[in-house]
Regions:
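Acidic-and-aromatic substrate-binding clefts and catalytic sites of carbohydrate-active enzymes
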Residues: 26-29, 51-60, 83-92, 120-121, ...
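Beta/alpha (TIM)-barrel catalytic core signal, keyed to glycine-rich beta->alpha loops juxtaposed to Asp/Glu
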Residues: 118-323
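Conserved, mostly hydrophobic/aromatic
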Residues: 6, 17, 34, 49, ...
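N-terminal small/glycine-rich loop or linker at the start of catalytic domains
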Residues: 7-25, 77-84, 114-117, 121-127
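CE4/NodB-like, metal-dependent polysaccharide N-deacetylase domain
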Residues: 42, 93-114, 153, 157, ...
Length: 323
């Protein structure tokens, strides 16, 4: 395992274990296998685990697996999908979310807490799901006036060590947050060869993840790359049922040429996709969506193989898959 630096957390493994796979967001796995995967990740050199209350039973499995005795070198992140609550409630909602998650996971503090809801301009109308925007989107004025002070307050209380944002919101507002006087201490950014957010993209504008990556690097904000295999679209086969019109299904079909290219190299598409993401400038650690030990072992092997060479990256980029 190679290691890099992630801001206030210091040295971290280049791979981060994501809670989505553990919580069965990315297809089925057993409770026992999820727990075994958690332990195997730590044994394999991964020292950062990314969790969230919305990842189904991820937090409960984590708590049962480590029983309050997490290895000292392992760091843990969590998230709050705050949305846009009534004025004056953001701080209490964020703290309540953190306290619930800490209790479930049998921890005293999170190393990183991410605002998981999309950040959007005032009055912004989403192309998809706009009627529910206050559930999944945090408006800019609320972010500045309440959310940032509340997150800084959680640091002062010792409940979190640092805070960040999930940079999947409207790109102009994510960039604005990265330029704000009180910047996030980390940002999660789409990092895949298609530049695609798939089914989690609700806005009409281009996703612009590489622009966000560049801005984060320019401003010294550490980056956790996400969706390296684009929710399965960059794997040999999808591991869950999706409708023909689902964005992730459409990406899978659009990536057939990529799978053909990997076949000529004698490589697994998921392995190459992970190595591509790890080769992207500005990605400090890559969050995995693995759900069992077999998938974990393959990604550990892919990380050990190192970055892709420039010719491979060029061949992939020439497929024209970027959104």
């Amino acid at each position: 395992m190679n290691y890099g630096k992630l801001g206030e957390l210091g040295s971290v493994s280049r791979l981060t274990l994501g809670g989505g796979g553990i919580g069965q967001v990315w297809g089925p796995t057993s409770h026992e296998e999820a727990a075994a995967t958690l332990r195997a990740a730590v044994e394999g050199g991964i020292d950062l685990i990314d969790t969230a209350p919305m990842y189904l039973n991820c937090e409960a499995i984590f708590g049962e697996t480590f029983e309050g005795a997490l290895p000292a070198h392992v760091r843990v992140t969590s998230k709050c999908d705050l949305g846009t609550p009534p004025v004056g409630q953001a701080a209490s909602l964020l703290e309540a979310s953190v306290l619930r998650s800490l209790a479930t996971m049998r921890l005293e503090r999170f190393d990183l807490l991410f605002l998981h809801s999309s950040i959007a301009p005032e009055g912004y109308a989403y192309a998809h799901g706009d009627s529910r925007r206050d559930k999944f989107s945090t408006r800019w004025d609320l972010y500045v006036d309440e959310v940032v002070p509340a997150l800084e307050g959680l640091k002062s209380k010792g409940l979190i060590r640092a805070w960040g944002i999930t940079g999947i919101g409207v790109p102009q507002t994510v960039l604005q947050a990265l330029d704000h006087a009180t910047r996030p201490q980390a940002v999660q950014v789409i990092a895949n060869l298609m530049d695609s957010a798939g089914g989690i993209r609700r806005f009409a504008e281009p996703a612009a993840p590489r622009t966000i990556l560049a801005k984060a690097k320019e401003n010294g904000v550490p980056v956790l790359g996400i969706r390296a295999v684009q929710a399965g679209a960059l794997t040999a086969e999808l591991d869950r049922d999706l409708s023909p019109n689902h964005p992730d299904r459409k990406d899978f079909e659009r990536a057939q040429g990529y799978r053909d290219l990997c076949r000529t190299w004698g490589e697994d598409p998921a392995d190459i996709a992970h190595r591509y993401a790890l080769s992207m400038d500005g990605v400090d650690t890559l969050i995995l969506g693995v759900k069992n030990r077999d998938e974990l072992a393959r990604t550990l092997k892919a990380e050990a193989a190192g970055r892709l060479d420039p010719a491979q990256i060029a061949a992939i980029d020439q497929l024209g898959l970027r959104t």
